[in-house]
Design a protein with these regions (language model features):
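Active-site recognition of the HExxH zinc-binding catalytic motif
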Residues: 91-104
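Metalloprotease/metallohydrolase-associated module, dominated by Zn2+-dependent proteases
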Residues: 1-88, 103-139
Length: 139
C-alpha cells in the first residue's frame, strides 16, 4: 500500500467515527511518511523490534492531534493485503482516539494498559509478532 493509498484509507476510516469523538481534536489526524522506532526498542541482530504505529498528542501550541506513522506500518505489516492493512490501521486509529477521549475525561485506563505492555515487553515476556518487528502494541 502506498502512502497515498493509506491516506485514502485513513480518511475513510476517520469518516466511520462519530463526529462527537472529534471534540477538541483541533489538529486532526496526520499521516507521516516515516517509521518511528520506539524509544524502548531492544536492538539486536542489526534491527529494532518495537515501532510506534500511532501517537496521540494533547496540549501545547499544536493542540490535540493524532499521528499515524506510514513507515512503521510498512515495516511491520508491509506483507499484508490491503484489506488486512486496513484492519490494522483501523485498530490503531481507534486506539489513538481512545487516548483522546480518555484524556478529555481525565481517565488514564489506556495509559495504564500501555504502561503494562511496556513492562512486559522490557521484561521479555512478549512473543515476536509481525514481519520485521517484535511485539505489537499501539502506544
Amino acid at each position: 500500500m502506498t502512502i497515498d493509498e493509506m491516506q485514502a484509507v485513513l480518511d475513510e476510516l476517520a469518516e466511520e467515527l462519530p463526529e462527537v469523538l472529534y471534540k477538541e481534536l483541533n489538529g486532526g489526524i496526520v499521516l507521516l511518511p516515516e517509521a518511528k522506532e520506539s524509544e524502548y526498542s531492544r536492538r539486536g541482530e542489526g534491527r529494532s523490534d518495537l515501532f510506534t504505529l500511532g501517537e496521540y498528542h494533547h496540549g501545547g501550541a499544536m493542540g490535540n492531534y493524532i499521528k499515524i506513522y506510514y513507515g512503521s506500518f510498512e515495516h511491520i505489516f508491509g506483507y499484508l493485503s490491503d484489506e488486512d492493512m486496513k484492519k490494522e490501521l483501523r485498530h490503531t486509529l481507534r486506539h489513538e482516539f481512545r487516548h483522546h477521549i480518555e484524556t478529555l475525561a481525565g481517565d488514564k485506563g489506556l495509559i495504564k494498559e500501555d504502561e503494562s505492555f511496556l513492562r512486559d515487553y522490557l521484561d521479555g515476556a512478549l512473543p515476536v509478532r509481525g514481519r520485521k518487528s517484535g511485539p505489537l502494541r499501539r502506544l
